[in-house]
Amino acid sequence: NDHPLTNFFKDDEKFIKFKNECTKTGTTEESIANAEKIGFKTNIKAVNPLDETKEVPVYFANFVLMDYGFGAVFGCPAHDQRDLDFAIKYKLEIIPVICPPGESENFKIDEEAYTGPGKIFNSKFLNDLKAPDESILKTIEIL
């Protein structure tokens, strides 16, 4: 199954090539985890639902499955390794939003995503909440 947005690109030669490349990869968790992360940048921008002043580019990617949720994800490259690998490859902005205990808010994400607990920052109304517990509850409340 393809995401409905693919219909807008069905005649785009670069998209067709991307889609054909994606079909070479299996759809099991293991095959997706081990596959090179590839993407197709659309001309679509999405508004960040937690910060309406920010727009983010919309990509099709080979590691997002239509059968999981809505077939779309809002990437968080600083805190998810697949998203980080993708962001590095496509030179996307990487903004940490969880500060590890004992670190300053100037810490950098390089090759490894930070997936541990900490304090939320760079997140406006979520700043200073504990991650993951308090921040998840507040985000659900807002959305």
Residue ranges and their predicted role:
Residues 1-94, 99:
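NTP-handling and nucleic-acid-processing catalytic cores
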